[in-house]
Amino acid sequence: MKKLILSLCAMFMLLSASAAKKSVKIMTFNVRCVVEADGLNQWKNRKDYAVNLLKFYKPDLFGVQEATHQQMVDILAGLSDYAYVGVGRSDGKTGGEYSAIFYEKARFEVKDSGTFWLAEGEKANIPGSLGWDADYPRIATWAIFKDKKTGKSFFYLNTHLDHIGVQARHNGAKLLLDFAKSHSKGLPVVMTGDFNAEPTDDPILVLTQPEDKSFVLTDSKSVSKLVYGPEGTFHDFGRIEFEKRPRLDYIFINGKMSVKYHAVLTDNLGKLYPSDHHPVIAKIEFE
């Protein structure tokens, strides 16, 4: 009897370990750039809190938006187990905000990566390009990662759509969808970001309900087995009333995978917040 129990326990542990290896925790986190006018919530006051939040939730990979080079340095200094892919949007180097992807360097290998600008034609390859009616240059950073534990590879893209330009959001979303379709090489796809759009707005529908049904993104929240946290993700450091907070931050997927949970993380220390956006995290299991 003891042998049977031990065998069953061993089998359960092996199955649990196998499931854990296949699972990947992915986060999207608009960290809010450095603005002195933010007062209590300016970066120098919340950077340790933001880094500790990342240490606590331990995403395997996470995409950031609005991160300046100094913020990238600060985040990396606090997370020695991670590396990142990405560049600043102003010059393709360290100038301007990043839409970078951080990853656990012991677990993942970068097979390919790049950054492009959300702009028309050849402008997409020119650092600092403005697209359509955008107020700022907008970028997308992507990578093909190989999970060293499972041998599985997947395509990950992270972005931040413009907050002003209606055409820029619409055309930017189309560009993102087309790029993911043409560059993912049939691999599972994860797309994270601040899309500056709510679920029924045009940019989200471009991604989830395109005319060409051969490649469609799915909102991970809509298929998650467990949904935790509020609907809204942008709170402006707590200044927006809870019920009126818009949902702007998403984790989209395409391919053979299941979503174990999707959570909007509302951590705060009274009036001090890790950012003006809530981080969003999802646990995904590739089949």
Describe the function of each predicted region.
Residues M1-S23:
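Bacterial Sec-dependent N-terminal signal peptides
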Residues S18-G78, R89-E97, K174, E287:
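N-terminal, active-site-proximal structural segment of metallo-dependent hydrolase catalytic domains
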Residues S23-E36, S99, D112-F116, K152-D162:
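Active-site-proximal beta-strand elements of phosphoester/diester hydrolases
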Residues R32, T68, H160-D162, F195-E198, ...:
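Catalytic metal-binding/acid-base residues of hydrolase active sites
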Residues L61-S153:
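Structured beta-strand-rich core segments of catalytic domains in phosphoester-bond hydrolases
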Residues G63-Q65, G86-V87, V190-D194, D219-S222:
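Active-site neighborhood of phospho(di)ester-bond hydrolases with catalytic His/Asp-centered motifs
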Residues P137-T159, V166-V206:
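His/acidic metal-ligating clusters that form di-metal
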Residues Q167, D178-V189, A197-E287:
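Metal-dependent phosphoester-hydrolase catalytic domains
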